[in-house]
Every structure is written in structure tokens, then in C-alpha cells.
């Protein structure tokens, strides 16, 4: 939208649906940032109805972004996956594969990579972590009950997942953090992040601990007091994600460094890294006047806009 507004001919390519990364999470999960930090349309109806300090659910944010694309008739090819990029600045040739496996080619002068960082889960390098009972995304969960569920990872994804599951299941949460750090996070979950009714029941927390094996649906946990074992039915290993390694090895020799002012790739001029690839997340892309404090008063999409205006001598609108 921003680049179209300065007169550039722009095409978006999305390998699945719009907001594919967000669809990996449970649709009722509350976002920790305010909607006004993330919303694209200043006239967004949810923002108008709920106000600047509203914590949206995942499904509401997906709807907001989908409505934005439709409202401005953004040219986005869904179910098209970027396979490779040949050529150089001003003369790129993109290989794209559609949902039926057919490959086509597109020409471009510049390429903005905004593929996110959730393609591949981080692994712990322990036995059993690739078992079918080990999940790396917290998505479908409403049907889970009367199970022994192990959570690995000390972030809010684990905390949110445990709050959702603990009323009907038995939970073990293994974290490397200290007890004070976990208590602080749970306090923030109930206060700053809007989940005022969050409550842990049926949950044991092992702090300053780590799982060393998941084989045969038995977790072996190294704790400050020695090793413990815990049989589980389902494990959520929520220790982060990373970009598709194969793709960025091909495109950028695995080098994700970029110019902080323009976001242009250091490895391959003409390619730009934005969003989670540049470690600038949803709250850094909003187009309203309500800027997230964490982004130091800068709307990062403006850097891309300024760089492109200079490259193509655009005046903007």
C-alpha cells in the first residue's frame, strides 16, 4: 500500500493465505500489544469501536489485515511461493510456484522480503523432539482434555497456552528462567497484556530446568535438584522459530544483515528485509498516529518508503 501510493508498480506474493503466520496460533489468543500499534487502516472499524488501548484477538487482527487488503484492492497473489531469485538489482527474475506446483517467472527491479520468521521451529537438539506427540505451534486446542501436557519454553506463547489448557488438563511447565522471572511474566500477563482473568490451575512449574529427552513420551528433566521424569500425552515445544533456512541460503547465502537506514540487504543489493526478518514485529508497522514506544518513535515502513522514493526519484502523494 505505501509503495503503491508513491507511484510504484507493486505485486505481493503470499505462499498461503494473507496473515499465514498468524494463523499458526489459536484464534482466540489475545495480542499483547494494543491494536492501535499494529493496525494498518487508521479508519479500521475494530479500532473505531474498541479504542486505542484494545488488545485484539488473533482472529480480529487477521480480519483487520484481510479487510485492509480488500479495501485498497492490493495486488496480492495468494497460494504462490517464492522459490528463487536470479539476476541483480534492476533486473531480478523471480521463480514462483503456485498451489498446484506450477512454476512461473516474474521480473522486478526491487524485491522486498517480508516472509516472517515462523517457517521452521527452533529445536532443542534432544532425543524424541520430532515425535508426533511434540508440537511446535499452539493452534488447535479446544478439543484437548484429560491429558498430561508438557510445555517447554519460557515465553508468553507457553503462558497463554497453559492458561487455555490447564482447567481441563494436567500441566508441567519446564523453563530455564528463574522463579522471579516467571512470576513477573505471569503478573504482566494479567496486567499489562490484558488477560485479567488468567489463572494457573493443575500446573507444576519447574524453573531453572531443561528437558534433556522426550523419547517414548517420557520427559527427562534436569532440575537444580537432579533429574526427574514425567510421562506426557502431548508436548508443546515453544522455543521460537526461524526463517526458512534453505530459502535464505539460496537468496542471501544465509546472511540476513541489512542497512539499518534503508533495510537493504548487505549481501544482495536490491533486496530489502522487513518485518520479523529485520526483527521489527507487528507493532512496528502500524499506519496510525499511535506509535509503539518500543520502536523509538519511528515507523519503520517509512524507511523503506524513503529509500524507494530516492531510488526511483518518486515524489509520493
Language-model segments: residues:
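Glycine-rich FAD pyrophosphate-binding loop
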Residues: 1-25, 170-182
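Glycine-rich active-site loop/strand segments that organize a redox cofactor
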Residues: 13, 17-63, 278-284
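FAD-binding beta-loop-beta segment adjacent to the flavin cofactor pocket
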Residues: 27-29, 249-273, 277-283
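Short beta-strand to alpha-helix junction loop
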Residues: 46-67, 77-78, 178-192, 285-289
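Glycine-rich dinucleotide-binding loop and its adjacent helix/turn
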Residues: 57, 104, 113-171, 256-268, ...
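A Rossmann-like FAD-binding core segment of flavoenzymes
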Residues: 73, 77-80, 84, 91, ...
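Short hydrophobic core segments
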Residues: 104-118, 150-152, 230-241, 273
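A conserved FAD-binding loop/helix module that cradles the flavin
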Residues: 269, 273-317
Amino acid at each position: 500500500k505505501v509503495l503503491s501510493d508513491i507511484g510504484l508498480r507493486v505485486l505481493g506474493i503470499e505462499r498461503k493465505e494473507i496473515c499465514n503466520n498468524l494463523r499458526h496460533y489459536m484464534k482466540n489468543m489475545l495480542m499483547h500489544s494494543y491494536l492501535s500499534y499494529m493496525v494498518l487502516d487508521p479508519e479500521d472499524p475494530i479500532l473505531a469501536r474498541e479504542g486505542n488501548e484494545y488488545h485484539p484477538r488473533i482472529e480480529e487482527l487477521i480480519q483487520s489485515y484481510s479487510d485492509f487488503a480488500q479495501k485498497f484492492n492490493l495486488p496480492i497473489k495468494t497460494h504462490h511461493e517464492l522459490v528463487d531469485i536470479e539476476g541483480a538489482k534492476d533486473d531480478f527474475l523471480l521463480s514462483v510456484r503456485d498451489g498446484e506446483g506450477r512454476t512461473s517467472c516474474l521480473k522486478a527491479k526491487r524485491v522486498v522480503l517480508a516472509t516472517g520468521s515462523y517457517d521452521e521451529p527452533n529445536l532443542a537438539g534432544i532425543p524424541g523432539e520430532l515425535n508426533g506427540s511434540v508440537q511446535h505451534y499452539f493452534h488447535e486446542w479446544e478439543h484437548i482434555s484429560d491429558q498430561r501436557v508438557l510445555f517447554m519454553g519460557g515465553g508468553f506463547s507457553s503462558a497463554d497456552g497453559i492458561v487455555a489448557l490447564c482447567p481441563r488438563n494436567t500441566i508441567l511447565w519446564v523453563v530455564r528462567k528463574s522463579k522471579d522471572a516467571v512470576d513477573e511474566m505471569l503478573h504482566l500477563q494479567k496486567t499489562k497484556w490484558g488477560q485479567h482473568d488468567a489463572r494457573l490451575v493443575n500446573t507444576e512449574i519447574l524453573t531453572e530446568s531443561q528437558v534433556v529427552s522426550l523419547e517414548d513420551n517420557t520427559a527427562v528433566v534436569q532440575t537444580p535438584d537432579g533429574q526427574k521424569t514425567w510421562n506426557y500425552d502431548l508436548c508443546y515445544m515453544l522455543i521460537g522459530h526461524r526463517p526458512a533456512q534453505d530459502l535464505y541460503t539460496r537468496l542471501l547465502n544465509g546472511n540476513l544483515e541489512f542497512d539499518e537506514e534503508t533495510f537493504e540487504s548487505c549481501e544482495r543489493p536490491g533486496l530489502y528485509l522487513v518485518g520479523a526478518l529485520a526483527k521489527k514485529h507487528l507493532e512496528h508497522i502500524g499506519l496510525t498516529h499511535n506509535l509503539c514506544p518500543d520502536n523509538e518513535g519511528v515507523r519503520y515502513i517509512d524507511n523503506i518508503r524513503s529509500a524507494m522514493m530516492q531510488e526511483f526519484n518518486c515524489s509520493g502523494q
